Each structure stands twice: as structure tokens, then as C-alpha cells.
Regions:
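Bacterial Sec-dependent N-terminal signal peptides
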Residues: 1-22
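Short S/T/G/P-rich N-terminal loop/turn motif that feeds into the first structured element of a domain
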Residues: 19-106, 110, 114-257
Length: 257
């Protein structure tokens, strides 16, 4: 499974562009239905694979949010985060009959009765879903892990506190991520702006970042960390934002163009 995930993630550098739109679904699963939820996503995995082949969307990823069972704040977090990527607004708003597509995918592979039962299960496994639509503003170049090296996924939501925030991310913090990437610590960083959200979603978050770090690598210290100018940039950059969402995740399913 690990090798399969790594082979999939290698394609990120080719499949992700600056102009991409991404929908986030933060999902809370009904108690006792975790295995059913995984079964549902396994069904959808083949459907999404076909959707990507049919140019309905660019990518689909399901992440499981890691939680500390002894931490009350962690227990409030979603159980899963699903990401659907699109080339542009035209692709995102393309009308799709998902049931017809699923029937096409499973024709000859699953009986009609079994298909209907699986299809009807989809809405029952979710207790709550909160949605965001974001636009990719910037990212680093993909730095593939070594064979067998695992990856750690960190998903952060920030509230911009002043008009300088986006510049700090793209003109200062990005350089930091690039240096960590060149040093072999980091595989990927992306910066996304919230365009819209559901009414039940967090109303404070304005931007999201995704950091993908390589496991079992030494900590990286910026070469300018002792300089006063660098320290002031860090201080003011941090002051331009407030982190309101912070999740560490494990990738469960993924398909890319």
C-alpha cells in the first residue's frame, strides 16, 4: 500500500497547476460506521478514477485526520478530509450524473441489487460535512521521496490579519519552504485562498496551506535565522496570520490525471 501511495504521489508535480480550484470536504463519520465509510470511499475510488479519465475533474484524495483520543480539541476535528481538484471553473461546474457514471463503472462487476445497496449507503455514513472551495495561489516544486520513504501531511487553515499576509506567504515563507525542499526535508508546500464555504464551515479561515514533509529527516534551520532582518520578517510574517485549523493527516485514497 505504501509503495502504491508513493507512486501515485510522484505525479503531483505534473498534475497540479497554479490556477487549480480545489474543493475540501471536512467529514464527520457517524459513530460505529467507520468501516462502512471506508467501503463507500472504496466504491467511489473507481468512480473518481473514471471521472478523471473523462476530464470531469483533475484529482481526488481522501485523507484520514490523525487524532489524540486523550485530547478534547482533537476529538472535535473531522474524521476525514476529501479533496477534489479541478483545472478551472468550467470543469468544476460541468454537470455530471454521478449515479450513471458509477453504473457504467460497475457494469458487469457488481449486481444491480448490490450496486443499489452500496449507492444508498453513501449519504448514511456521514454525520456532518463542511465544505470549502479554494484557489491555488502558489506552490513549491515537487521533491519526490526516496523509495520506501514515508511522508507526513500537515493541513493548516489561517485567518489573514492584515493585507500583507499573502505576500509574506508567497515572498518570504515560500523561500523558506524551498530551502527546506532543497535540503531534502520537505516534499511539497502549497498555498490556497478560500473563495467560498458552506454555512456550517469555519467562518474565520481565509487561506489554507499543505506541507508534505519527508519522514525520518533531520530538522532544518534557515541559514539566515541568526540575522536581525530575518527574525523581523519571521515576527511580522507570523503576526500577519492566525492559525485556526491544524491537522496532521494520512492519505487513504488518491487518483490523479
Amino acid at each position: 500500500m505504501k509503495k502504491q501511495i508513493l507512486s501515485i504521489i510522484f505525479t503531483l508535480t505534473f498534475s497540479i497547476s497554479f490556477s487549480q480550484l480545489i474543493s475540501y470536504e471536512a467529514i464527520w463519520v457517524n459513530e460505529g460506521m467507520e468501516e462502512d465509510y471506508i467501503s463507500v470511499e472504496e466504491i467511489w475510488s473507481e468512480v473518481k478514477k473514471q471521472a478523471i479519465a473523462d476530464d470531469i475533474q483533475d484529482f481526488w484524495i481522501v485523507f484520514k485526520v490523525q487524532k489524540d483520543a486523550t485530547n478534547a480539541d482533537d476529538l472535535k476535528k473531522p474524521d476525514y478530509i476529501v479533496m477534489n481538484g479541478f483545472k478551472d471553473e468550467e470543469q468544476r461546474t460541468k454537470q455530471t450524473n454521478w449515479k450513471e457514471l458509477a453504473q457504467k463503472v460497475y457494469k458487469g462487476k457488481m449486481s444491480k441489487k448490490k450496486f443499489e445497496k452500496a449507492w444508498e449507503m453513501t449519504p448514511t455514513v456521514r454525520k456532518e460535512t463542511r465544505n470549502f472551495l479554494v484557489e491555488r495561489l502558489d506552490n513549491t516544486v515537487w521533491n519526490a521521496p526516496d523509495e520506501g520513504q514515508s511522508l507526513n501531511f500537515f493541513f493548516n487553515g489561517f485567518q489573514a490579519l492584515n493585507d500583507d499576509y499573502e505576500n509574506y506567504e508567497m515572498k518570504f515563507f515560500k523561500d523558506w519552504h524551498e530551502k527546506r525542499t532543497n535540503a531534502g526535508k520537505q516534499a511539497w508546500w502549497e498555498f490556497n485562498k478560500v473563495l467560498s464555504r458552506s454555512k456550517n464551515a469555519n467562518q474565520d479561515v481565509t487561506h489554507f496551506t499543505m506541507d508534505i514533509l519527508k519522514a525520518d529527516t533531520p530538522n532544518y534551520e534557515h541559514p539566515d535565522s541568526s540575522l536581525f532582518t530575518h527574525q523581523m520578517l519571521v515576527k511580522n510574517g507570523v503576526a500577519s496570520r492566525k492559525r485556526v485549523i491544524g491537522d496532521e493527516m494520512t492519505m487513504m485514497f488518491a487518483h490523479f490525471e
